[in-house]
């Protein structure tokens, strides 16, 4: 127990009402957030002589201050707890690393509805289908729907400004409602209804209606129409045959858990309208000494309740672990959803099979993750030995990319003890230097990255400079001039130069810009981690450079036209669907864009044609 914190005096002031407590260390950092039905009883349990676990002992030893927020109900306490966890990210709480909202397929409520991927709040008028496990699953489904039910997927700005059909119409993936006379209102509405039924899991109704239409077309001797509908029927059947189908109407999230070597994997299986939409594995950050029950309970609460990114709730949640707060969780979710949400921990029949599947997937994903982490750990340990460091907890690497000196981009990638930390990758647009001057680019990015206050935990142990002696000299010069509150001598600056043939395994490493470097054997684990982070940095820089180059390519022609500033350029590209669409547009079409006069439209048309 902390000698500074007076637990007895504090507990005398605590109420027995429900609420949330926040524990702080000597530095004023929130180290733990918890909730309680009875705050006094719960907080008293931390200051007994026989604590429940080593984790609790370590936590209590660091407490210097506790804040308490009283709530009206346990449900309020549960919601507030998870909002605080998301806000403070306390190191003694189990933390859900990936808190992105799940994507949905959106069917708009326009006169001619469109299909699109959607994340976040559902403000737009229309229908939402999902959730899907990731953006790839949505894009794959949209591509499939476009082949079977050719309704539009273009933005409204593009749709409203077309006078002739686009390429999607030419290849049969859109009915072309943007141009009058290409498709009847009835036919388009019918295809939209098929999409609605299909995404709602009512495949049989889609097939029944299509078969009836095909037979009628045959009777009317409209054989081309009958053949088109026949192809549509076959496409729907091919898709439905591949899908794993559960009981019709099942609307479930199935959560399986695996726990080993201090690491947890939570696998979530999404079933909507009786179909498995997909699944996803999570690896929450687990403080040492945490029990599996706490991992499951905290994960489920964070997964469904945290902040504005609240998940779409299914009718039922299946778990393979008993929760002490199961009733409270179900009541809280039901209150949020405005309907009854069931939390089931002992399912039978098909539901038990789903749970077994989720548990198996969790175990498999955890084995893979542990294997990868073991490899990364071995490589970082080997590199630390080569560099004579006690350990490497964080490593950063920089690379520069440009084309003939133009659109220069610098990348910074970050590795921690578990490997790539992609959420902390950064790109820097480099400006104000002589084109092609990589040294100046490196100088600029290092000053921008390190010439400011940095949290203790984010100071790298190793900074890898791709480019050899010259770039390393720039890095040394920058660090010599830094005037910062953190220890600028802590990071080890390491230069890496590719061999004469630029082949992997022939790299030379430099501690200093002067003198000879040294090489590592091609099979060295230390070399492998250097190659890994350098390749990540190179790919990240190239990706950023390509995006920047593409952006410039799309706007450079317009930038030369007098009277077309940034806002008008953006409006033109948006309404015409890109530079190619603008090149193909007539003067009359260009003049329809907001803010573009007839005279300016003629000038734009002439400039693009010549």
UniProtKB/Swiss-Prot annotation:
- Matching SUPFAM superfamilies: C-terminal UvrC-binding domain of UvrB, GIY-YIG endonuclease, RuvA domain 2-like
PROSITE patterns for the chain: GIY_YIG, UVR, UVRC
Superkingdom of this entry's organism? Bacteria
Subcellular location as annotated: Cytoplasm
Keyword annotations from UniProtKB, A to Z: Cytoplasm, DNA damage, DNA excision, DNA repair, Excision nuclease, SOS response
Name a single GO cellular component. Answer: excinuclease repair complex
The keyword Repeat is assigned to this record: no
Residue ranges of the GIY-YIG domain?
16-94
- A single GO BP annotation from the record? SOS response
Q: Where is the UVR domain?
A: 204-239
The Swiss-Prot or TrEMBL record annotates one GO molecular function as:
DNA binding
List the NCBIfam families hit by this protein, alphabetically. PRK00558.1-5, uvrC
Q: Which family does it belong to?
A: Belongs to the UvrC family.
Its job: The UvrABC repair system catalyzes the recognition and processing of DNA lesions. UvrC both incises the 5' and 3' sides of the lesion. The N-terminal half is responsible for the 3' incision and the C-terminal half is responsible for the 5' incision.
Q: What is its quaternary makeup?
A: Interacts with UvrB in an incision complex.
Kindly provide the name given to this protein in its UniProt entry: UvrABC system protein C
Gene designation: uvrC
